Regions:
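Membrane-interfacial helical/loop segments at transmembrane boundaries in membrane proteins
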Residues: 157-182
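N-terminal signal-anchor module of multipass membrane proteins
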Residues: 1-51, 301-307, 312, 316-321, ...
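Hydrophobic alpha-helical transmembrane segments
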Residues: 175-197
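Membrane-interface helix-loop-helix junctions at boundaries between adjacent transmembrane segments
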Residues: 65, 69-71, 85-157, 161
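Hydrophobic core segments of alpha-helical transmembrane domains in multi-pass membrane proteins
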Residues: 38-49, 96-108, 238-250, 300-304
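A cytosolic-side transmembrane-helix exit/cap motif
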Residues: 58-66, 116-133, 257-268, 316-325
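Predominantly late transmembrane helices and immediately cytosolic-facing juxtamembrane segments
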Residues: 113-119, 242-259
Length: 328
């Protein structure tokens, strides 16, 4: 089964360019002020990051080959916003639990996005069935979520605290301490076991299936490089770059053939209303904190969390329709 994926060479070049270019600048970025490190997040508000979910309400029509109709579109948009409002309510009532839930959901979702990319690029010959694809998603999603926690626990805790403080400043320290109570060594061990299991399973498949050796090598090359990327670079920078140039771009490459006939310009135009609406809502709810670098990123991430809930539902539905986890 051929899965749609636009801009294969250009998209890969841009993603890898962002990762390798950042690694080359690691000594400079290590001492960079916070105002510089948050620049990828500023960029994400208008390009690749936030816009990658802005056309979600159009996806069901495109995938079913239906004409866009105002009534169903309005209903989908209202449901989308209602689910986002429920997420914000969770951040108000139980901010620490909401932060943990958001991190776990992002782990699953970013892994989900990379599994689609592996399949669409034809890099999946070593992934033999649903269980191994789920493990691939767990490994890929762990890289941006778990490696920074193990390598930079203080910064990770500061960002989680800033997220909790976005709506409940009195809960910030509790959320921060929750992160600091996790021993970094245990995170490294858990990640090591996960990656080792994935590598061994892939090697067994590659041993039996010669065509899988190349794809396993490509997959593990990305896993190794991304591990170094998140371990060596400041998390504010690395996760922001990944959000834009890796995850966001790959999802847009998935959407372009479905929604915009492969046209980047048309897809960008379709994303404008949703992006502006999302920015307006984030600005309205978090106007007092967005101007502060770390606090602003925390507030922005809570806004993204509200959108991530319904976005994951849409992407999961796409996965089922396209048989990402079950098809050959």
């Amino acid at each position: 089964m051929t899965l749609p994926f636009a801009w294969r060479r250009g998209g890969l070049a841009l993603a890898w360019g962002g990762v390798l270019g950042s690694l080359a600048l690691a000594p400079v970025l290590a001492g960079a002020p916070v105002a510089v490190l948050v620049l990828p997040w500023v960029l994400s508000a208008v390009a690749l990051g936030l816009p990658h979910g802005a056309v979600d309400p159009l996806v069901p029509f495109a995938m079913r080959g239906e004409r866009l109709r105002l009534g169903p579109l309005a209903a989908l948009s209202v449901a989308y916003l209602a689910l986002g409002a429920l997420v914000l309510a969770a951040w108000w009532t139980v901010p620490t639990a909401a932060a943990v839930g958001f991190l776990l959901l992002t782990w699953a979702h970013w892994g989900q996005g990379d599994v689609y990319a592996l399949r669409a690029l034809g890099w999946d010959a070593h992934l033999d069935g649903t269980a191994q694809r789920v493990l691939a998603g767990a490994v890929r999603g762990a890289l941006p979520m778990v490696v920074p926690l193990a390598a930079h626990p203080e910064v990770y805790a500061d960002v989680v605290g800033a997220m909790a403080a976005a709506l409940r400043p009195d809960r910030a320290e509790a959320a921060r301490q929750f992160v600091l109570d996790v021993p970094p060594w245990s995170v490294w061990v858990g990640l090591g076991v996960l990656v080792a299991a994935y590598t061994v399973w892939g090697a067994v498949i590659a041993w039996r299936r010669p065509g899988a050796r190349r794809t396993l090598g490509l997959d593990l090359a990305e896993v190794g490089t991304l591990t170094a990327f998140f371990a060596l670079l400041p998390p504010l920078w690395s996760v922001g770059v990944y959000f834009c140039l890796w995850h966001g771009l790959r999802h847009l490459a998935r959407l372009a053939p479905l929604v915009a006939d492969g046209s980047a310009r048309r897809l960008a135009l379709y994303a404008v209303p949703g992006t502006l609406g999302a920015l307006a809502l984030v600005g309205l709810v978090f106007a007092e904190t967005l101007h502060q670098p770390v606090a602003g990123v925390g507030a922005y991430l809570v806004g993204i969390a509200a959108l991530t809930g319904p976005h994951v539902v849409v992407v999961a539905w796409m996965d089922v329709r396209q048989r990402v986890w079950t098809g050959r």
